[in-house]
Amino acid sequence: MIMVRRRQRPAKEAASSSSGGASSGSGIPVDQALPLNVAGNLLEDQYFASPKRKDCRLMKVTQNGQLPEATMMAHNKDNKAGRTIGVPLATRSQTRTIENFFKANAAAKDSQKTIHTEEQLNLGNQELKLDDEELNGQIKLDDEVLKLADKQINENLPFADEVDAKAEQKLMDEELQQVVEELLFDGSSRASSNSPFYQHDMDVMQEIQQTPEIPHIKKVTEPLEGLGSLADFQTHRSALRDSHSSTHSSSTDNIFLQEPVLTLDIDRTPTKASSIKINRSFELAGAVFSSPPSVLNACLNGRFNQIVSLNGQKEALDLPHFDLDQHDSSSCDSGVACGLTANTESPAGQPRRRKPATPHRILCPSPIKTALKVTGGICKVGSADPLSPRKSPRKLPTTTAAVAACKSRRRLNQPKPQAPYQPQLQKPPSQQQQQQQDDIVVVLDDDDDEGDDEDDVRALIKAAEERENQNKAPATANSNKAGMKTMLKPAPVKSKTKSKGPTKGQPPLPLAATNGNREMTDFFPVRRSVRKTKTAVKEEWMRGLEQAVLEERCDGLQVRHFMGKGRGVVADRPFKRNEFVVEYVGDLISIGEAAEREKRYALDENAGCYMYYFKHKSQQYCIDATVDTGKLGRLINHSRAGNLMTKVVLIKQRPHLVLLAKDDIEPGEELTYDYGDRSKESLLHHPWLAF
């Protein structure tokens, strides 16, 4: 055994020397009392030994009691002459190595002693078996042979004890040498394979693995029980001492004392500096707008970053001027895209109209009627104004007067027939006003025929004659205005309401009579919508169902006989989905009366199932069609995957059950619907309800 022992104090010299002498005189016999006493003294000395004391030495148990007093006093005086543990100031990690070593050695020696004792027991058992065989073979042997065999067995036991004592002494010497080498080498680390501690652990593991399995143990002697309790006591005291120590883990268990195993490889190479370029001008690179930019973008020009071309070239784009139309014809729903698209010049230099903003086109009245009203309504002769009552703004180009003059126009001045247009006023107006009122210009397109020109002249003459007849009446101050209105709006106003276009045998109205405007319906017919709302379609469908019920309609049906079912109904013509097929006709009764009829029908085995229960407006009803009335609705069979469905139709405050096509039905297909009865009693009497 090896222990760490503090040098004995003078007060305890007698006790320690007497105990040491007793132990040395008698040697170390293997019995029950001696190991326990030695272990107790050893653990007690270890518990009170300080790891940082310089007077701690390594010694054997047998040498502890044999030290003379002079030697002990010399060691007390000269501490430096002795052999210290490791370094002058031993740390906790170094002393823990010794403690762990003691634990491992104690466990190894216990296992070795157990192995030796078990081997001896096995040897004795084998000899006993041989003796038993000899006794069985030689029944007539005397009792003296048995005594000799027992004597031989008893002689083997002291011999085994002596062998154990020598082996133990040899192990103690080897362990002492290993501990000294460990302390000099600082072999507390198990990381290196050259460490003595590592090699000792490997040897112990190999010895444990090489131990043979013991087949059977009959007895456990008292010394083995003492050694087992010794190991338990040593482990308990060592754990108790560790619980009171300052540190609870060795350097290898403490994560803060371990070497780092993870390293972070961070790329610290400098990156290229990114640059941001701010443009102070509104620049576009070949952008094509489907609509002109808003005014807000023009106001924010030069304040925010805009689109920059990829090649880095900056080309300023001059934004064109857009005229905002304020009249009604520029609405988005009107189909006119003048206010929503940009006019891009074509290669020929002529303006090209783009696709309207909305996919549909709604016909609106002529813009001349919605524009601002002009006082005279007619143009002066020889004026350079490109607009005229005949031309609307959407037909005129928006460039210059030279472009407008490209279109040939023919102006007809009729000064002679215009004389009767002026009424006789009480006070003659001035010459300038009279000249403005006398000048009436009628503008016609080149595509008008020569016959239209003659009709216009005749219309002017006729209007002049009517004007003369009106002037015969007493003229007043307001007659001039009324006359001008009647001249500008004659009888064609009535023709608008009478007919949409020219009737047969009646010539078209002259342009002068309508102030140079034609009706929109002369060129485009009025589009009438034939679409219906969902509510209107449903109402029409319900009216059709009511009409079919009132007519008791049952066409397209045929009665056939089916094997295992009886009679059934087959479609004789195709039926569309949700189309009326037939009505389930019977007696409409209450629930109470239906219960009484069921009891009465239960007595008749031949009575079928013809009672249909349904709910309408939170009230239960029943239609009893048990009585054969010749209606086909009662003959339609059951199927959980039927092609008909029921619907309640209310006619004159009375609910009716009608059968509608659930899907498209082809001719020759059997008509079925789901009865909906899933009760156990019904399935017991009518199993076909499950299919």
UniProtKB/Swiss-Prot annotation:
InterPro entries: KMT5A (IPR051760), KMT5A-like (IPR016858), KMT5A-like_SET (IPR047266), SET_dom (IPR001214), SET_dom_sf (IPR046341). It is found in: Nucleus; Chromosome. Residues 555-676 form the SET domain. S-adenosyl-L-methionine binds at K565, G566, R567, Y610, N637, H638. Residues 421-430, 471-481 have a biased composition (Polar residues). Residues 14-27 have a biased composition (Low complexity). It comes from the Eukaryota. The keyword Oxidoreductase does not apply. It holds the Pfam family SET. The modification Phosphothreonine is found at T252, T344. The keyword Ribonucleoprotein does not apply. The modification Phosphoserine is found at S195, S250, S281, S346, S383, S388, S392. Residues 1-29, 341-363, 382-401, 407-437, 464-516 are annotated as: Disordered. Its main location: nucleus. Its EC number is 2.1.1.361. GO terms for molecular function: histone H4K20 methyltransferase activity; histone H4K20 monomethyltransferase activity. GO terms for biological process: cell division; chromosome condensation; DNA damage checkpoint signaling; heterochromatin formation; methylation; regulation of DNA damage response, signal transduction by p53 class mediator; regulation of transcription by RNA polymerase II. Keywords: Cell cycle, Cell division, Chromatin regulator, Chromosome, Methyltransferase, Mitosis, Nucleus, Phosphoprotein, Repressor, S-adenosyl-L-methionine, Transcription, Transcription regulation, Transferase. It catalyses: L-lysyl(20)-[histone H4] + S-adenosyl-L-methionine = N(6)-methyl-L-lysyl(20)-[histone H4] + S-adenosyl-L-homocysteine + H(+). GO terms for cellular component: nucleus; polytene chromosome. It is an enzyme of class 2 (transferase). PANTHER family: N-LYSINE METHYLTRANSFERASE KMT5A. Histone methyltransferase that specifically monomethylates 'Lys-20' of histone H4. H4 'Lys-20' monomethylation is enriched during mitosis and represents a specific tag for epigenetic transcriptional repression. Mainly functions in euchromatin regions, thereby playing a central role in the silencing of euchromatic genes. Required for cell proliferation, possibly by contributing to the maintenance of proper higher-order structure of DNA and chromosome condensation during mitosis. Belongs to the class V-like SAM-binding methyltransferase superfamily. Histone-lysine methyltransferase family. PR/SET subfamily. This is Histone-lysine N-methyltransferase Set8. It comes from Drosophila melanogaster. The lineage of its organism: Eukaryota, Metazoa, Ecdysozoa, Arthropoda, Hexapoda. The gene is Set8.
